[in-house]
UniProtKB/Swiss-Prot annotation:
Name of protein: Flocculation protein FLO11
Propeptide residue span(s): 1347-1367
Record PTM text: Extensively O-mannosylated. The GPI-anchor is attached to the protein in the endoplasmic reticulum and serves to target the protein to the cell surface. There, the glucosamine-inositol phospholipid moiety is cleaved off and the GPI-modified mannoprotein is covalently attached via its lipidless GPI glycan remnant to the 1,6-beta-glucan of the outer cell wall layer.
Broad class of the protein's primary localization: secreted
Membrane topology of the entry: Lipid-anchor; GPI-anchor
Disulfide bond entries: 37-201, 44-179, 141-205
Amino acid sequence: MQRPFLLAYLVLSLLFNSALGFPTALVPRGSSEGTSCNSIVNGCPNLDFNWHMDQQNIMQYTLDVTSVSWVQDNTYQITIHVKGKENIDLKYLWSLKIIGVTGPKGTVQLYGYNENTYLIDNPTDFTATFEVYATQDVNSCQVWMPNFQIQFEYLQGSAAQYASSWQWGTTSFDLSTGCNNYDNQGHSQTDFPGFYWNIDCDNNCGGTKSSTTTSSTSESSTTTSSTSESSTTTSSTSESSTTTSSTSESSTSSSTTAPATPTTTSCTKEKPTPPTTTSCTKEKPTPPHHDTTPCTKKKTTTSKTCTKKTTTPVPTPSSSTTESSSAPVPTPSSSTTESSSAPVTSSTTESSSAPVPTPSSSTTESSSAPVTSSTTESSSAPVTSSTTESSSAPVPTPSSSTTESSSAPVTSSTTESSSAPVTSSTTESSSAPVTSSTTESSSAPVTSSTTESSSAPVPTPSSSTTESSSAPVTSSTTESSSAPVPTPSSSTTESSSAPVTSSTTESSSAPVPTPSSSTTESSSAPAPTPSSSTTESSSAPVTSSTTESSSAPVPTPSSSTTESSSTPVTSSTTESSSAPVPTPSSSTTESSSAPVPTPSSSTTESSSAPAPTPSSSTTESSSAPVTSSTTESSSAPVPTPSSSTTESSSAPVPTPSSSTTESSSAPVPTPSSSTTESSSAPVTSSTTESSSAPVTSSTTESSSAPVPTPSSSTTESSSAPVPTPSSSTTESSSAPVPTPSSSTTESSSAPVTSSTTESSSAPVPTPSSSTTESSSAPVPTPSSSTTESSSAPVPTPSSSTTESSVAPVPTPSSSSNITSSAPSSTPFSSSTESSSVPVPTPSSSTTESSSAPVSSSTTESSVAPVPTPSSSSNITSSAPSSIPFSSTTESFSTGTTVTPSSSKYPGSQTETSVSSTTETTIVPTKTTTSVTTPSTTTITTTVCSTGTNSAGETTSGCSPKTVTTTVPTTTTTSVTTSSTTTITTTVCSTGTNSAGETTSGCSPKTITTTVPCSTSPSETASESTTTSPTTPVTTVVSTTVVTTEYSTSTKPGGEITTTFVTKNIPTTYLTTIAPTPSVTTVTNFTPTTITTTVCSTGTNSAGETTSGCSPKTVTTTVPCSTGTGEYTTEATTLVTTAVTTTVVTTESSTGTNSAGKTTTGYTTKSVPTTYVTTLAPSAPVTPATNAVPTTITTTECSAATNAAGETTSVCSAKTIVSSASAGENTAPSATTPVTTAIPTTVITTESSVGTNSAGETTTGYTTKSIPTTYITTLIPGSNGAKNYETVATATNPISIKTTSQLATTASASSVAPVVTSPSLTGPLQSASGSAVATYSVPSISSTYQGAANIKVLGNFMWLLLALPVVF
């Protein structure tokens, strides 16, 4: 029984809905007819529509669309109002109709005697209403009005009787509409604009429609390349919003303290952005339907990308990644930022709990918990980070490095291992398994591209990085502790009794070699790193590829690193931990507990206070032990004016210079390019540092065991001998340490190791160019070396370095000797350090000693002397460890901004090119030679050549030429004296200007020589031949490029309007003219002067070939006797001219206005370029024969440059009468064409657009006159050279299409080339023809409504008849 009741219910519901008039599915789309469009937009308000009517001598008319209503589908009823400039009586009109209508009626007759139609009473002020099919969409919301023509016929038929009083120009004409036909001057070939309105007159179109966003690529945090990632929790989901990089962001979370968690899933969400509308251009004359919209609508949907990662060690072979958490992290530059409040693995940058902008090519890391950085880092909680980390505060990372932060174990792009041997090219490990972009292992062996080991020696021969720690600590370099750790590469090694990793190598409780590079971290405060360096900071133990600082001594072995942290903080070259942290790398910055800006290309770290680092150096600061490869300061501001690095903590630390300075508990100025470090706790410096807790630095560090570092890195050891064969460093502590020189100074009241020289408990003078260290007293370092002092002031007047301790240590050679309780060899390096024994270092080597184990970047030894006689370094340690060869490498990339082409205007792109044009004025040098013959004939003519350049323009160059000949007389005279010949040449020098262009400067040089001649009157000399120059001559030809610049704006109603401005840009082409094989062949008997041109060619920064030319005059040496057979040969040299022009391109930028709509602005740029034109010389000039006086008429031209930079020339006729014998023949008149540059002025109109108080867009026009030059060729007339006829005038305007969306190119007019450009207010409108659609659409939809109701009622009646059967 339920089925019949259900059927009855459905039938009754259908009947009820029909009776109430609810629309059914049978009602067509156009049922709601008559909707009016509120917004009717003039599509091209800036075009000149009077120009075409003026050209046709038609009185001006205007057209406006007063109303539009939607009928159905794509049919609209429009009303137009046409008004003439003047009133014309109706008696003159014969016919008026609208033709070419794309609508139900192709022709709308308004007035006509033949058609017996009289719908209007004024042909100059009338309205007309008709229907059109709008088939061409402007975008997804708007549609164009189809074009049509209004045909006027005056004075036809019976109206012709009034022709005598007609005064309005043309009598029969068509006036057309459209925005799609105009030239580059803004002159429309149509007479009225086109209009557009919202599709279906939907006045809400665009307001509620959301647009789909095209997202970039999703990447997990373990991938290479710059990516932004953020993670708020461990193994949680990271979100990134408003990231500008083309790659999506995903964050990878590592496991926390439990290594058993199977997998962690990290996701990336893209927050919905405000709905934006993308307007598209369509040029499809589709059938009357607007359904086909190829536009992309952006939706505010959120995309989610998840990545599952096991919490077991994961190798991360690739390079950099960026993560941010709990806040948007913009990564505008090519770098990466990562952060995580939990273990986060990221190959590049991480930031946590705060927005982390990474605008520059540097790297920043910060963490409120142990964070390891760019190479490898470890912390009291195992944290490794490939580059930079930041936490608990915004950390900008402007550079192309990487930033990571985590309050839990985080592994990074390098490798870390802990509690177990780990091998990896960049391996990190933690007591909790942490995976990073490279490899990390924890509590189990992990193999990665780098290698780290703990509790056992681990050699790392390659340029990777290895870190190990008794607490999981990994660092990009290598550190070892409690066991020897070799570091063959130029990385850095650090070790600490507490987990500390450094960007180079760190190991703890076991030797760990780290051959790789450095990193920067910052924590507990925003750490901006605008420069291409790296910054790291952490409020907890943070390790960083370069610098580290800790509440225990922190060595910073490299030459440019800064660290600061209220707790152990490690930086790109220095690491810090609750135990000593070495910082082996050469340029890193860390900041903690305070924002740390790093504007320069170095790295800056600060702690507990902002630390700006404006210079290209690095700054580090820490209220606890701070190590910095260059400069560190703590608890006080530390200015670093030099080009070094500066570190500061608990106070702002500016680092303007490229030096490095470190200070602690007191301000430390570092004016010179040197480096200074001081700390109230043990601080190690840029080369090698050691602390009361074993800390090894920049290249190799070992703790409780010897660590050899044979390469140019730095090695530090603590509690055990650690040799460091690499370069030198100076440290001071417990007092301000100024380091004015380009060296580095570090001091520490606790064990301090320094790559150069360290001394403790006593002053240490360093007379040589090495480095000296002292402790517990201020240490000035005036020279270019490095000084460290401890417990006493240590002056370092010389550029050397000396360390001494309790016992003497001789270092005779320029290398270094270090002895330790066990032998340790370092084959490639030179440095000497000794501990517990005084060590003099007379040579340019370095010596360090400390009452506590001190390791230095070069070589350190403890408890036993170590001689180093040769230029290498010998290190002995409690266990032998050799490192054959190694070097440290750091790279950072600078960001390059490329403006992609808009999807809306794919042809537009931005070109930036610097072109240099060299203009050379070739002034012929006329040398008159006096000959001892009775009569002399001087022939002056002009050589002109014409050619066509690559732009198709005809150009020519002319220059006067004088040839002096000797006419024989009845007597022959022999010259018996010597003649003096003057040779004028030009000396040119070439250089490169600041733009990278090759320029040259030339200056004339005159040499006078004496030419001997024969004394015999009857001497006959052989002919002297002079070859012509083969150097190309470059000439500058200027022209004008016409372009149209347009800008787009959006009205409050959401309408997009575009303004166009036509501009004429003068430009110059560079043309090179190649000379012919020979210029003039002169017979003997007369001194002959030959003028040629010497040119030099170079390539400017734009890759264009430019040249500079200068005239050179050479006088030949000939015998003294004269003869009658002299003749001259005219030049046939090709002349090449450089003609520069400008290529016009349009750059577009897209933004979102307050209404959430996407608008696009366009900027037109002109890029100069050069074309080369070769001109062929004219026919030979007529030679002069003897015996008759000869009159030669020629033309002299002079060239100059006008204000627009164009080359113009002025020519004048010149007549020369020779003095010759009576039998000389008369030369014919000149037939050489003369080319003249005629300046003219191009007049253009520039328009500017603004918005008035009513929100309307208004346009102002300004007329400008731009001078330009035309080339005219003159051919001599038949009556001699004086009568010139103008036979040709070459003009060369260039038509340029501004975008690739130009539709059809209109034919050129007599005034200017016509260019079809996009419609002035947006997308292109294709020209509509006069075709009339043959199908019709019902104009009344109520018929369909009634039919639907009848059909429904019929169905209901049928069902009623069926009901008894059912029941």
